[in-house]
Curated annotation (Swiss-Prot):
It comes from Listeria innocua serovar 6a (strain ATCC BAA-680 / CLIP 11262). Residues 153-201 are annotated as: Domain III. Residues 64-142 are annotated as: Domain II. InterPro entries: DNA_helicase_Holl-junc_RuvA_I, Hlx-hairpin-Hlx_DNA-bd_motif, NA-bd_OB-fold, RuvA, RuvA_2-like, RuvA_C, RuvA_C_sf. Keywords: Cytoplasm, DNA damage, DNA recombination, DNA repair, DNA-binding. Residues 1-63 are annotated as: Domain I. One of its GO terms (biological process) is DNA recombination. The keyword Translocase does not apply. This is Holliday junction branch migration complex subunit RuvA. Pfam families: HHH_5 (PF14520), RuvA_C (PF07499), RuvA_N (PF01330).
């Protein structure tokens, strides 16, 4: 069983990405392959779920362990297969989904592909009350997003906000901000270039 893969994102298609490591390219199915577009040609860590059938072995990829956990929980629901589960979490924002499950909002759930009224009720029946850890983690993460630029210099704050606008996640930025802050009196452009160098190491 694979937990994650770390390698170069070589190819991005509408259905999957290819990550190369050890001179082997791994085809990984993801809910939104184009969310990896900014990482194309660079090293990325992708969390994995290996799905085995008699006629096929597939790797499904996720950008966080929370997404993967929710995917596995959805697979435990009768009537939900890997492609349906992946489509449900493709937005990358699991909080509204879990909120809908907890509040028994089957109308919200039927907005997802291949989820009818019966399947929506089954999701609620099987998963309500079992996803608290995931939603708590995501809420804490989102609350931290609001504080990411607190206490930074104007130039560094501008650089961080620009990097967010380019699609870099709060998780990625929080790893490099302490190192960026050690460099005093840089322009916003210089901070951006520094961040890009740090994130590709």
């Amino acid at each position: 069983m694979y937990d994650y893969i770390k390698g170069i994102v070589k190819t991005i298609t509408p259905e999957y990405i290819v990550v190369e490591t050890g001179q082997i390219g791994y085809q990984i199915i993801t809910g939104n392959p184009f969310s990896f577009q900014r990482l194309e040609g660079t090293e990325a860590q992708v969390f994995l779920y290996q799905h085995v059938r008699e006629d096929n072995i597939s790797l499904f990829g996720f950008q966080s362990t929370e997404e993967r956990y929710l995917f596995k929980k959805l697979l435990s629901v009768s009537g939900i297969g890997p492609k349906s589960a992946l489509a449900i979490i493709a937005s990358g924002d699991v909080v509204p989904l879990i909120t809908a499950i907890e509040s028994e909002d089957d109308v919200y759930l039927t907005k997802f592909p291949s989820v009818g009224k019966k399947t929506a009720r089954q999701i609620i029946l099987d998963l309500k009350g079992k996803l608290a850890d995931v939603v708590a983690s995501e809420i804490v993460y989102k609350a931290a997003e609001n504080d990411i630029v607190t206490g930074l210099s104007p130039q560094l704050e501008e650089a961080v906000l620009a990097l967010e606008a380019l699609g870099y996640s709060t998780r990625e930025l929080k790893k490099v901000i302490p190192k960026m802050a050690k460099e005093n009196d840089l322009t916003s452009d210089a901070y951006i270039k520094l961040a890009l160098r740090l994130m590709t190491k």
